[in-house]
Amino acid sequence: DSSLQVDFFDVHPYILINYQGTESDLYTLVHELGHAVQSYMLSDKYEYWEFGVPEFLVEIPSTLNEILLSEYFINSVSEESEYMNSTFKYLDKIKTNVFKQAQITLFELKLYDNEIDTNNIGTIYKEINDLFYGETVNSDQLISYEWCRLSSLYMNFYAYQYITSFGAAMYIFNSLNSKKEALFIGKYDDPIEYMREYDVDFESKSMYNILFDKMNQLLLTVK
C-alpha cells in the first residue's frame, strides 16, 4: 500500500505516505487524515482501555473526507473539461468504494464455498470480474491475478465495510452539520445501535439510496 495511518493513545497519530503531490496522492492523504483526526479526537474523549474504533466504522471518516474533496473539486472548477474530469473521478471513487468492494466480498464468499487451490483461485476471481463488468468488457487473462495485490483480503471480510462506510459517509455528508458527533464512537460501543442515534441506519435501504441517487446525478451531468 502507498499509505498507512498508525494511532497511539495520548500521542498524535502518524501517517506514512509516499506523497508526490499528485491529485491521487491528495485523495490518499485526506483519506488517511480522516483516520488520523478521528483517532486524535477519540484520544481526548476516552480512557486508554476504551480507545479505538470499531472495525465496522473505521472507514467512515476516511471516505467522508474523499467525498468532501470530490465535492470541492466539482464545485470549484470553471472549465467544462475540468468539471468533467472531476466528475469522472468522483464516479470512480463510488465505483471503487462500492462496486469494486462488492466484487471483492463476493470473491471471498466464493472462496469459502469452494475447495481452493492455486489453479482455481484466479479462475473464480475472473468469473466474478466478468459477471460485474458484463459482456461489453473483454478482460485480459491477467485479471485473474489481481486478487494477489488486494491487502484487504488479509483481513477476513473487511472489504464490504467500505460499502457500508461509504454509504454512511454520503448520508452524513448530506446532513453534516447535525452529524458531527457521530465520529466520536469508542471501540466498546455497539456500532450499529450507536449510529442509529444519529439517524445513520445501516439496515435501511434509504441510506444507500442517497448514495445511488448521487451516482445517478453525477452520471446525468456527464451524458
Predicted regions: what is each one?
Residues 20-24, 34-35, 69-70, 167, ...:
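Short, glycine-/Ser/Thr-/acidic-enriched flexible segments
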